[in-house]
Design a protein with these regions (language model features):
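Short alpha-beta junction capping motif
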Residues: 82-96, 108-117, 125-129, 156-207, ...
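Beta/coil-rich, acidic/histidine-enriched accessory regions frequently appended to metallopeptidases
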Residues: 305, 309-355, 362-363, 704-756
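Beta-strand-enriched, solvent-exposed domains that form extended recognition/catalytic surfaces
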Residues: 339-477
């Protein structure tokens, strides 16, 4: 079966028979006694400062969580512990837990409890690995210190004066991990803290983020102890404590998940969604050397109808579908490391991102990337498409150091959603590392449009080099480039190219839409001239040149948040209909615009310096109003989106103009800006934005109060009017110092508000 083949290839799993007994396991049976010691006199714990810790997963018989955050399917461990042979280990989801907790006295008291618990004595001797100087200074009145060490090999371990090692960072090698493991087995204690999701941001040699399952040294150590650091983030401010409630245990969740997959009789204590979520967090982090849990879930999935449970026409896969959820997860993880020649087409790939017609030619094409394109950065479109599970061969002339290849534009990951209309993760990006023959092979189980991504050091660099590539095994995709006479001349032929996804390109915007939506598009020139003008509007309002990198917009059938979201690319729904796209409906775009498109690109254009608390969904809509006027002839004050907002100010003023209410209502807040625009036009906004750009970086406002002051003074200076009374009327706090800066101007208030 597919799942069996994929997993056995990539994970090198032993046979399910290696599991041994199948009776119930007393997961975390000793947790109560240990947590009583760890949480003695602790009433509350919370996030350390402004850090975002990662997840800690407990899955072994002798491991348990001490603190978690959230609830239901979204509950995540953040501090875990385990006993291992004669020793003990305590794991934190971030090193900042050691650096001044920021959660009151209980945080520091908990660290004292933790060190004593790990040592099994009141006055342990503590060594610090790869840091911990601040912690040592704070704790020196409580414990004897045996030193600070940058290398595990230098640690004085058991028999040499150390009871507990506090591991603050670094990445010891396999030999050093062995020393720490032996230290714990012999009765030593280890406290470690690391941000696992932060490590995923570090690129490996293949152009991928670090894999916490294979690359995170800490997981290689604590995995054998029944703990792993997972890839989820835990941003909650307050934590659940084991002294107050039962916390999740992935071993127990695994029992429930297997029962749900195999249809075993008996009611489970853990709901399907929670079981699947907990096991998913474990499987994404569990080292491949595990010979118990991975084979167990693989064996259960092999007996299920996995391929029938993936998303398809008229069928979503719910997170609570344990077999579908975990089957897709394990297959996705397996395919990451599978050699290109052995990557299969994923079940459901023909549904999305889509099928390639039978008989479509696989072609070889040479592509030249100019130095200018390399400097611009971003994804460089090729007009080529990789079929699901089909090998793409790349060769380069003049070297490809630092270059990456991307397959697929639909980059949103959906694992956090309650249900999936498509596989949750369907794109890949790889470093171009040529084999001795000078070529590189890659395959995606889902297929997708092919892009080249320039080296980071080339982006914006005057001396950036271009590159020449040969791509073999791809299918031609519809592609139009505004300003290229050949592209316009050959459009009627190119729009019939067989790939299921098309791209329309101009200097400022690239649209990625279903090919079916452009098969009848006769005038791509007029359409992309519209989008070029739209792209120009954003820097035009901000008073700055067009950015070098074009914006991108990609249609999808499901995205990670909302109906649309900002970023690179802007992601939007719309692919549900393969024969239609609002992005190519020029008649509607020129008469009504598209508030959603303009809004999301407005997020990309807004600046922190003039966006303070409560205006994240406001300052971007200045661009929505501007483009509505420029691209569809809609007067900003008469924009339909404002129609439902115009009655709000009177009610707000009548209630006393409370700033907290203002910040909670983006439509109300936008009226404050729109009223100025109505009476003075766009020029003062352009003048104010340009003043921000021209100001020294050291003068950039940082706090909300500074941003509020600066926005009032910049706009007052642009208008040559004192806006202090206007801001006061709206309830937006301004300091007396800022009021004084513009007091020499004539005060202004809209006519309908009365005299200032």
């Amino acid at each position: 079966m597919l799942i069996s083949v994929c997993l056995s290839i990539a994970l090198a799993l032993p046979s399910p028979g290696a599991l041994g007994g199948s009776g119930p396991t007393p997961w975390g049976a000793e947790a109560g006694d240990h947590n009583e010691a760890l949480l003695a006199n602790i009433t509350a714990l919370g996030r350390p400062g402004n850090s975002i810790p990662g997840e800690v997963v407990a899955f072994g018989e002798n491991s348990f969580l001490v603190a978690s955050a959230g609830g239901g399917d979204g509950e995540r461990g953040v501090i875990g512990a385990a006993t291992f042979h004669r020793g003990r280990v305590l794991v934190f989801g971030h090193s900042s837990f050691f650096g001044g907790w920021g959660a009151g006295a209980d945080g520091e008291a908990f660290l004292l409890n933790s060190i004593r618990w790990a040592a099994g004595k009141e006055q342990p001797r503590v060594a610090f690995l790869a840091g911990g100087h601040d912690l040592a200074a704070r704790l020196k009145v409580h414990f004897a210190e045996t030193g600070h060490y940058q290398r595990c090999a230098d640690l004085p371990l058991r028999g040499s004066g150390t009871d507990v090692v506090v591991w603050v960072g670094g990445a010891p090698d396999e030999e050093q991990i062995g020393r720490l493991s032996a230290f714990v087995k012999g009765g030593g204690g280890v406290l470690l803290g690391v941000c696992p999701w932060g490590n995923q941001q570090i690129w490996d040699g293949q152009g991928r983020g670090k894999n916490i399952r294979t690359d995170l040294s800490q997981n290689q150590l604590i995995g054998e102890m029944g703990l792993v650091l997972g890839d989820a983030t835990v941003g909650d401010a307050a934590y659940n404590l084991a002294s107050n409630r039962a916390l999740p245990h992935a071993g127990q969740a695994m029992d429930a998940a297997v029962a749900y997959i195999t249809g075993s009789e008996g009611e489970q204590e853990i709901a399907p969604g929670s079981a699947a979520s907990q096991v998913a967090g474990l499987l994404r982090a569990l080292p491949a050397s595990d010979d118990r849990f991975l084979p167990r879930i693989q064996s259960a999935l092999e007996a299920s109808s996995f391929a029938e449970r993936v998303p398809g026409p008229g069928h979503k896969t719910r997170k609570s579908d344990v077999a579908g959820h975990l089957g897709m997860l394990l297959a996705t993880e397996a395919w990451r490391d599978t050699p290109a020649s052995r990557v299969p087409a994923a079940p459901g790939a023909d549904f999305f991102p889509g099928a390639i017609p039978s008989g479509a030619l696989r072609i070889t094409r040479s592509l030249d990337v100019t130095p200018e394109e390399a400097r611009q950065g971003g994804w460089i479109s090729t007009g080529l498409y990789a079929g699901p599970g089909e090998v793409i061969r790349i060769s380069a002339t003049g070297g490809a150091a630092g270059w990456k290849l991307r397959i697929g534009a639909h980059k949103d990951k959906l694992w956090h959603k309650d249900s999936w209309s498509r596989w949750p993760e369907i794109t890949l990006e790889r470093q171009l590392v040529m084999d001795p023959g000078g070529s590189f092979e890659v395959a995606s189980p889902f297929g997708g449009l092919i892009y080249f991504v320039p080296p980071r050091n080339a982006v914006g660099a005057a001396g950036a080099n271009g590159a020449s590539f040969m791509v073999a095994g791809a299918v031609e995709a519809p592609l139009f480039r505004l300003g290229d006479p050949a592209s316009a001349k050959n459009w009627k032929q190119r729009r019939a190219a067989p790939a299921p996804w098309a791209e329309l390109v101009c200097d400022g915007m690239i649209l990625t839409i279903p090919s079916g939506a452009i098969r009848e598009l006769d005038d791509p020139v007029a359409l992309m001239e519209y989008w070029q003008r739209a792209a120009d509007c954003y820097p035009e309002l901000r008073g700055e040149p067009q950015p070098a990198r074009a914006e991108r917009m990609v249609e999808d059938i499901q995205i990670s948040a909302g109906w649309m979201h900002s970023g690179y690319p802007v992601m939007t729904h719309g692919a549900e209909r393969a024969d239609h796209s609002a992005a190519v409906d020029l008649d509607t775009l020129t008469t009504a615009g598209n508030w959603g498109y303009f809004h999301e690109f407005g997020h990309n254009a807004q600046k922190r310096e003039w966006t303070f608390s409560g205006t994240g969904e406001v300052t971007n809509n200045l661009f929505s109003l501007y483009l509505g006027e420029q691209m569809a002839g809609i007067e900003p004050w008469n924009n339909p989106w404002l129609a439902g907002q115009k009655d709000k100010p009177a009610e707000y003023f009548a209630k006393g103009s409370k700033f907290s209410d203002w910040k909670r209502s983006p439509g109300l807040a936008l009226m404050m800006y729109a009223t100025i625009q109505r009476d003075f036009g766009w020029e003062p906004f352009q003048t104010a934005f340009k003043a921000y750009l021209e100001a020294p970086a050291a003068e950039s406002p940082k706090t909300d109060a500074q941003k509020q002051d600066r926005w009032m003074t910049r706009m007052s200076q642009a208008l040559e009017r004192d806006l202090g009374p206007y801001f006061e009327y709206w309830g937006v706090p301004i300091t007396e110092a800022a009021r004084g800066e513009v007091a020499h101007f004539e005060p202004w208030m809209p006519e309908e508000y009365g005299k200032p």
